[in-house]
Regions:
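Structured, active/binding-site neighborhoods that engage oxygen-rich ligands
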Residues: 1-181
Length: 181
């Protein structure tokens, strides 16, 4: 239902104007040349939700994120059950498996159609999409939110746009909840 824009569209697709249960649906993915129809089972999580839950499982009682656990266990194993996911986070997840790499040194290059790119060009929104649990676990502690989100972001992204975007999103979550409960 994420692509339905009005109740008429819901009625046409599902026979009902209000959705109260999960439905299996199909989505075209993969682009023009290598596209395919992905069957999304009722109740399935998106890649963003999967990684958000991975981050949540990595948070200690005191609000700190076990970044090594997230990187070497959650992120590395995510590839076995990932639903979708962008190129940036998938490559980072593959590269974090190297024994010589730590959560704070996941530096890599990768080939694309246009040449060779490196982690510093990884500026997508994958980091921002998973940081909600960090902000919620540290409400009211902006410095801790910034630090934990920065550390979590650099595991998969090297471009300042991705890192600062995730930090700004975490700050916004904190401020909205603190000042508009």
């Amino acid at each position: 239902t994420e692509f339905e824009t009005n109740t008429q569209s819901l009625k046409e697709k599902f026979g009902n104007a209000r959705i109260e249960e999960f439905h299996t649906w199909e989505k075209k993915v993969g682009g023009r040349f290598y596209g395919y129809v992905d069957i999304i089972e009722a109740g399935s999580y998106s890649d963003d939700t999967q990684l958000l839950l991975s981050v949540a499982r990595s948070i200690k009682k005191n609000g700190e994120v076990d970044h090594n656990y997230f990187a070497k266990v959650e992120l590395a194993n995510w590839l076995t059950y990932a639903r979708g996911g962008g190129r940036t986070v998938k490559i980072a997840a593959e590269k974090i498996k190297r024994k010589s790499v730590t959560w704070f040194s996941n530096f890599y290059t990768y080939k694309t159609n246009g040449g060779i790119l490196d982690y510093r060009q990884s500026g997508a929104n994958g980091a921002a999409m998973r940081i909600l649990p960090i902000a919620l676990a540290n409400l009211g502690n902006v410095e801790k939110i910034k630090e934990e989100i920065f550390c979590n972001s650099i595991i998969t992204h090297g471009h300042p746009r991705a890192i600062l975007g995730a930090m700004l999103y975490g700050y916004a979550i904190d401020q909205i909840i603190i000042f508009r409960p």
